[in-house]
Regions:
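Sec-dependent N-terminal signal peptides
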Residues: 5-14
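Sec/Tat signal peptide C-region and signal peptidase I cleavage site
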Residues: 16-20
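Patatin-like phospholipase
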Residues: 21-108, 116-414, 418-430, 441
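Flexible glycine-/small-residue-rich
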Residues: 212-215, 321, 383-385, 438-442, ...
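Outer-membrane beta-barrel and related beta-rich outer-membrane complex signature
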Residues: 289, 517-519, 558-565, 616, ...
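Gram-negative/organellar outer-membrane beta-barrel architecture
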Residues: 407, 426-583, 590, 661-670, ...
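C-terminal outer-membrane beta-barrel translocator/porin domains of Gram-negative envelope proteins
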Residues: 445-450, 581-697, 702-708
Length: 768
């Protein structure tokens, strides 16, 4: 019996060690070697077939090709290369000049986009116009259309450029790329709308293939069917920069990772003549000065570049525009790259003349697809747990006879994308059915912002939101600020939608430290802090994406303490408890959050506060702010505005006074050029302001501002004390504004109302 047990134990031990992670059997190793041998045999077979195709060809490009005999198949292969892909347009223009008919187009990355456009019937002029008119800085963001965001998103979430999430299993989830690519995808859908109902790329006016990489296996995938916009998106999704494109539970990235110059694909499709355009850069060299981006680029393109060197030698006509030194992400001067493509192709004009066939060229051009409205009778939704068909129908644009243009479909998709819990959305049309595929934010959404303001210093703000969807949508949020003036707040915002009408309810409780900066003769002489415990209840209505009105009630316990500088400013050394209420209306129709050129921003608020701690202080009043922006031209815009406020009461708490100065507005602070942050305190004030803005680029702006102020204060010893309208103060200055991935950066120089020296201010990020 013991012998049998020993033998059985020995068998199970042998079985375990044969198939465990650490010990692998001889048979397992041999099987793996055989698998690799089979893969190499397939590669050899592929190369042999290419060799046979080349050996069959007897075409001499130095002589006129006879198109009346056996019609040679001409393929155009366009390599990847980012912004340098504009050179492809110049090559196409020269091919059209010589009326060279193209039968096959194969492209990788940007080559797949330019090639795809030509394959559906765009002319080189149309391609150039489309590319030159693209707003690349807008495409290279995750921003949703601000006009479509709800008012709560505009007020709060616009301030957080960084996002991540914690899933339902409490695993921290970082983005798979810097950008989710949604805006690029929507642009591609717009470009390829004329091919919306073409699913087989052999049926396009010119047979077409795009190259992408299966991220799971690292293998090359040749795209011959599907949605053309998705195909080109898969082909150009640069690893780490753009999130991989998910399709049928697989993830795809830039085809340049495996095959940046797919001449072999053209050969496999039976091409007799291959015209290939190479815009690839010289292979980057790793040295001590290399950075993370260089290393990632090297790793992600190693195999693709290795193939490129071989494939170059397989082209019948290799055209190499002089663009190798142009940066792949530099989208300036694209028209110059187009010219370089023309120059490079024109060198071989004598060859292209031999490939000319006006008859075949005309037949090719006559097949060009045109944009047409699409009949949509059915709607399908995939990937949704929260979004409903009812909501999708509510967002549907109004059209006649269910005929949707490309703009209608893109606007519909943008509206779905603008919903706060939607992270990605794509669509395709099959016959009379539109299918929306969505990716929703689930679990805990974490947002972050890094900020800096002159005098205030640096800060990091984080918000974590747990959404709860039902009859009432509830967002439970924790907000925190790490800075010299820390804050933490817990709140719940709930809303119930009735069509476009929304009922809002909120509750919050928090502790915050706010600074009180005190200046005299232009110098900061003291800093006090307000340590505040605050809780509020609110109820409001949003009648559109731009307007919200409501009422709030709350309790506050304020304890002001000295922090630094002059200790003798007793006015701010106070402690009080109060209950307060306010009525408010907020309107926001701005086209941009940071540097708007169009729209209105309006804030009206009436307030009341009553001390309950025995200090017998009370106050009531109101405040307003209104700014209006109008474009004067494509680059120039003008903004005008007014602001003001008045409070009255007994024993007014000095820390409740209006705070004037700095470049940004906040809850009780009003910007004024010519004063630093909190440069003046007032119980009544009025500001008139105006400014000019010039857009140098999509992200860089020149700013000029002027404002006038009159104010009164309650006998504060460190500042002028005049009655309202007794004096008028004038501030003016100029600077730059830069939209960055961290948020806006402002550098501004102005006069200083309290000093003969200029006032220099720097702001980065947002004000909370």
């Amino acid at each position: 019996m013991l012998k049998k047990i020993f033998s059985l134990t020995l068998f199970f031990l042998s079985f375990y060690y044969s198939f465990s992670e650490g010990v692998q059997s001889k048979e397992y190793k041999i099987d793996e070697i055989n698998r690799v041998i089979e893969e190499l045999k397939l590669q050899q077979m592929h190369l042999e077939l290419m060799k046979e195709e080349i050996e069959k060809s007897n075409i001499d490009l130095s002589k006129k090709v006879n198109f009346n005999e056996k019609r040679p198949k001409i393929a155009l292969v366009l390599s990847g290369g980012g912004a340098k892909g504009a050179a492809h347009i110049g090559v196409l223009r020269v091919l059209e000049k010589y009326q060279v008919p193209i039968d096959i187009i194969v492209g990788t990355s940007v080559g797949s986009i330019v090639g795809g456009m030509y394959s559906v019937g765009y002319s080189p002029d149309e391609i150039e116009k489309t590319v030159l008119n693209l707003k690349f800085n807008s495409l290279l963001t995750n921003s949703k259309d601000r006009n479509l965001k709800n008012i709560e998103e505009k007020i709060e979430n616009d301030k957080y450029p960084f996002t991540m999430s914690i899933d339902k299993n409490l695993k921290l989830s970082f983005p798979m790329g810097i950008l989710n690519g949604e805006n690029i995808y929507l642009q591609l859908k717009d470009i390829f709308s004329r091919a919306e109902n073409v699913k087989n790329f052999n049926e396009l006016p010119i047979e077409y293939r795009a190259i992408t990489t299966d991220l799971q296996t690292g293998k090359e995938v040749i795209l011959a069917d599907g949605d053309l916009a998705i195909a080109t998106f898969k082909s150009m999704a640069i690893p780490s920069f753009l999130e991989p494109v998910k399709d049928n539970n697989k993830f795809y990235v830039d085809g340049g990772v495996v095959n940046n110059f797919p001449i072999d694909v053209a050969l496999s499709l039976g091409a007799d003549i291959i015209i290939a355009v190479d815009i690839t850069a010289e292979t980057s060299k790793i040295n001590e000065k290399s950075n993370l981006i260089t290393i990632l680029d090297k790793l992600s393109t190693y195999n693709g570049n290795r193939k490129t060197e071989t494939h170059k030698r397989l082209a019948d006509l290799l055209i190499v525009p002089d663009v190798k030194n142009h940066d792949t992400i530099d989208f300036g001067n694209l028209n110059e790259l187009v010219v370089e493509g023309e120059k490079a192709a024109e060198k071989y004009g004598y060859i292209l003349a031999n490939l000319s066939s006006p008859k075949d060229f005309k037949e090719m051009k006559d097949k060009a697809l045109k944009d047409e409205a699409i009949q949509i009778n059915k709607i399908k939704l995939e990937g949704n747990n929260i979004l409903t068909l009812k909501k999708v129908n509510e967002l549907k644009p109004s059209v006649k006879n269910r005929k949707f243009t490309k703009n209608d479909l893109n606007d519909w998709t943008k509206k779905i994308y603008s919903v706060s819990y939607i992270e990605r959305v794509s669509y395709e049309v099959n016959d009379d059915t539109v299918i929306f595929k969505v990716k929703e934010k689930d679990g805990i959404n974490i947002r972050g912002s890094i900020n800096y303001a002159s005098n205030y210093g640096g800060s990091m703000n984080i918000a974590a939101t747990v959404p709860n969807f039902g009859l009432w949508t509830r967002n439970y949020t924790i907000k925190a600020e790490a800075s010299s003036f820390p804050k933490i707040n817990f709140n719940n915002l709930s809303f119930y939608e009735i069509g476009k009408f929304k009922i809002l309810g909120g509750a919050s409780i928090g502790y915050e430290t706010d600074p009180l900066f005190i200046y005299k003769n232009g110098d900061k002489i003291s800093t006090y802090t307000t340590n505040k415990f605050i809780s509020t209840l609110s109820l409001g209505t949003a009648i559109s994406n731009s307007i919200v009105s409501g009422i709030s009630l709350g309790y506050a316990n304020n304890d002001n303490k000295y922090l630094s500088g002059n200790r003798d400013i007793y006015n701010f050394n106070e402690n009080y408890q109060a209950i307060f209420s306010s009525l408010y209306t907020y309107i926001d129709t701005l086209n941009e959050n940071n540097y708007p050129s169009k729209g209105t921003l309006l804030r009206l608020e009436g307030f009341n506060s009553q001390d309950i701690g025995g200090n017998e202080s009370n106050l009531n009043g109101g405040m307003f702010s209104a700014d209006f922006y109008t474009p004067l031209s494509e680059k120039f815009s003008v903004g005008v505005g007014v602001a003001g406020g008045k409070m009255r009461g007994d024993e007014l708490p000095k820390s409740s006074l209006f705070r004037i100065g700095g470049l940004r507005n906040s809850e009780t602070a009003f910007s004024f050029v010519g004063l630093p942050m909190m440069g003046a305190y007032a119980d009544e004030f009025y500001i008139l302001r105006g400014g000019l803005q010039y857009k140098l680029t999509d992200t860089f702006h020149l700013l000029a501002k002027y404002n006038m102020l009159t104010y009164s204060s309650d006998s504060l010893p460190f500042q002028d004390n005049y009655s309202i309208w007794d004096r008028r103060y004038h501030g003016y200055g100029g600077g730059i504004g830069w939209n960055t991935f961290l948020g806006p950066i402002n550098i501004f120089i102005s006069n200083d109302l309290n000093s003969s020296t200029p006032l220099f201010e720097v702001y980065m990020g947002y004000t909370f």
